[in-house]
């Protein structure tokens, strides 16, 4: 399977997972409200979706790195490093939550808690940085411009969300949620279309 084909399928899968996560989150907010903690079974569904999306996001960024021209591969490499940290952190948090924490008879991440802080660091800072560094890979016009702008917006919103836990106001963190739960699935759909339309793309040499 070519890098573009792999990128297309993984980006499409990320978009669909994002829709599923957003729908689940909407249900959670309608049931529990914005301030109340989300509990099982809705929380368990969200954690499983997160565990699936973490390695998929690594595949998406890897495909972006493969797509980059030679003089822009450094951006793809930096993005890949940041997304790998993100995936490891969030996977560890949710694996522990789904196994050890529940076997102790408890569940849920309520702020402030160490596990929740690690989770927000992963999704806000490290995912946000990965998206921001992935954006310069797409230097062209047309579809590439749309992907570049989407990555910049999503990444900036994710990073901005770190202000919430930093100041202890979790309503401010909703900016980050909008970045990765709403904007990112749209960007992944644009990525899937770009990779699909450019199956014969070969990494270009530096100008």
Task: Locate the predicted segments by residue.
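Hydrophobic, aromatic-enriched alpha-helical segments typical of multi-pass transmembrane helices
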Residues: 1-207
């Amino acid at each position: 399977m070519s890098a573009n084909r792999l990128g297309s399928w993984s980006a499409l899968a990320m978009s669909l997972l994002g829709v599923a996560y957003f729908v689940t989150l909407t249900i959670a907010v309608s049931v529990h409200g914005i301030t109340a903690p989300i509990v099982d079974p809705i929380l368990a569904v969200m954690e499983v979706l997160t565990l699936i999306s973490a390695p998929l996001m690594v595949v998406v960024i890897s495909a972006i790195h493969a797509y980059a021209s030679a003089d822009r591969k450094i951006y793809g490499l930096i993005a890949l490093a940041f997304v790998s940290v993100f995936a490891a952190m969030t996977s560890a948090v949710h694996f522990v939550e789904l196994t050890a924490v529940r076997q102790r008879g408890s569940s849920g991440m309520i702020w402030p808690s160490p596990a929740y802080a690690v989770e927000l660091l992963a999704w806000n800072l490290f995912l946000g940085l990965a998206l921001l560094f992935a954006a310069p890979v797409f230097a062209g016009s047309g579809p590439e411009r749309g992907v570049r702008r989407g990555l910049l917006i999503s990444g900036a919103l994710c990073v901005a969300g770190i202000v919430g836990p930093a100041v202890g106001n979790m309503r401010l963190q909703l900016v980050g949620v909008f970045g990765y739960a709403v904007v990112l699935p749209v960007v992944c759909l644009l990525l899937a279309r770009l990779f699909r339309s450019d199956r014969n793309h070969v990494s270009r040499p530096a100008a």
